[in-house]
């Protein structure tokens, strides 16, 4: 599988979705970890390198757009896929303008998330 070496960090405040995504991504061959917000993400990223973030837009505290803005402001080039219930055009456009690499509205098919992760990683490798 092409994704076996990719380490993915999922950042979402929904515990059931975090568990589902972590398990599904691992089953698909990714090195996956899931955390509940910005502080846990910062701790995880300080300890380990991640190849891609799956980032929820609406979270308590620092939301996904603020996290994306902060990461891009520090020149972090880690690919970001926004995964969120906010699916209207304005939210998608703002997320992409702030530096997200892709955007997937909830509800979603986990296979589509895997396909999008692989597509982002292929583009980064090119």
Predicted regions and their residues:
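Active-site beta3 strand of CheY-like receiver
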Residues: 48-54, 59
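The feature encodes the CheY-like receiver
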Residues: 18, 60, 74, 88, ...
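Charged docking surfaces used in two-component/phosphorelay signaling
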Residues: 19-27
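Short amphipathic alpha-helix used as the core "switch/output" element in two-component signaling
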Residues: 65-76
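Acidic catalytic/metal-coordinating carboxylates
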Residues: 36-37, 63-66
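Short hydrophobic/Thr-rich beta-strand motif most characteristic of the beta2 strand and flanking loop
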Residues: 29-38, 44
């Amino acid at each position: 599988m092409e994704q076996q070496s990719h380490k993915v960090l999922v950042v979402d405040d929904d515990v059931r979705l975090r568990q589902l995504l972590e398990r599904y991504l691992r089953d698909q061959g990714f090195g996956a970890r899931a955390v509940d917000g910005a502080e846990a993400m910062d701790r995880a990223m300080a300890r380990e390198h991640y190849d891609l973030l799956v980032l929820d837009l609406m979270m308590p505290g620092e939301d996904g757009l603020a996290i994306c803005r902060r990461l891009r402001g520090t020149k972090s080039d880690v690919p970001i896929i926004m995964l969120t219930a906010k699916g209207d055009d304005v939210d998608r456009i703002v997320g992409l303008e702030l530096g997200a690499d892709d955007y997937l509205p909830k509800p979603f098919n986990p296979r589509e998330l895997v396909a999008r992760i692989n597509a982002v990683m292929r583009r980064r490798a090119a």
